[in-house]
């Protein structure tokens, strides 16, 4: 339940608008509300981090509005809470009116939801399930440079799950569409909320089965097999992609060293 922030309120401050995050001095604000001119703002507590409250304030600031990607090097728990705040702020902003009857909506006091004041329809934040998979062939891992990542970073393959599709089917389809190969021995590893914009990454490892690499140029700039001890530039630590790569490297080391 939201409330008006007072002078002595303190904690972590997620100030967000239109999927942007307020980052004074490039950092997520922490401390007393008065230090950040937040007294009098309406805020919603969205969690706790190390015993301190994490507050969401839906507001556009004139300066220092950036991407949640800029705080990806925070502790994972705090980064995920910042991502939750950005996603909730966008959810509340985009659900002011009911999509069925057009009447004004209001936030639920008991859950992350918006309620219609007229037809009683209930809306929840949209979450887009995605798969991400590390594919191993002997002592090598398949890594690709995506068209949206023109910074030299190579990563594993990923994509959105389609309507009526299982996670396993999504892995097989995405891998075939993007790289032209087939995989086998699919194993679930972990999951990670990913606020770009509202994804839930489900991570897998798999073994190469058959086929030659034929990339989809709309998705990839290039893809290739890289030996575990001679890898290109990788995603930053803390991402599920980096974990999958490191787990695959560990398997290769155990077998080939």
Curated annotation (Swiss-Prot):
EC numbers for this chain: 3.6.1.-, 3.6.1.22
Any single GO BP term: NADP catabolic process
Provide any one GO MF term from the record. NAD+ diphosphatase activity
Can the keyword Hydrolase be found in this entry's annotation?
yes
Q: Where does a divalent metal cation 3 bind?
A: 174, 178, 219
Per UniProt, the cofactor note for this protein states:
Divalent metal cations. Mg(2+) or Mn(2+).
| Pfam families per UniProt | NUDIX, Zn_ribbon_NUD
Indicate the secretion signal residues: none
**Span(s) of short sequence motif Nudix box:** 159-180
* Binding site residues for a divalent metal cation 1: 158, 178, 219
All copies of the Nudix hydrolase domain together span: 125-248
Query: Which parts of the sequence bind a divalent metal cation 2?
Result: 174
Q: What does this protein do?
A: mRNA decapping enzyme that specifically removes the nicotinamide adenine dinucleotide (NAD) cap from a subset of mRNAs by hydrolyzing the diphosphate linkage to produce nicotinamide mononucleotide (NMN) and 5' monophosphate mRNA. The NAD-cap is present at the 5'-end of some mRNAs and stabilizes RNA against 5'-processing. Has preference for mRNAs with a 5'-end purine. Catalyzes the hydrolysis of a broad range of dinucleotide pyrophosphates.
Give the similarity note. Answer: Belongs to the Nudix hydrolase family. NudC subfamily.
Enumerate the PANTHER family for this protein.
Answer: NAD-CAPPED RNA HYDROLASE NUDT12 (PTHR42904:SF6), NUDIX HYDROLASE, NUDC SUBFAMILY (PTHR42904)
* Protein's name according to its UniProt entry: NAD-capped RNA hydrolase NudC
The organism encoding this protein is Shigella dysenteriae serotype 1 (strain Sd197)
The organism's lineage is: Bacteria, Pseudomonadati, Pseudomonadota, Gammaproteobacteria, Enterobacterales
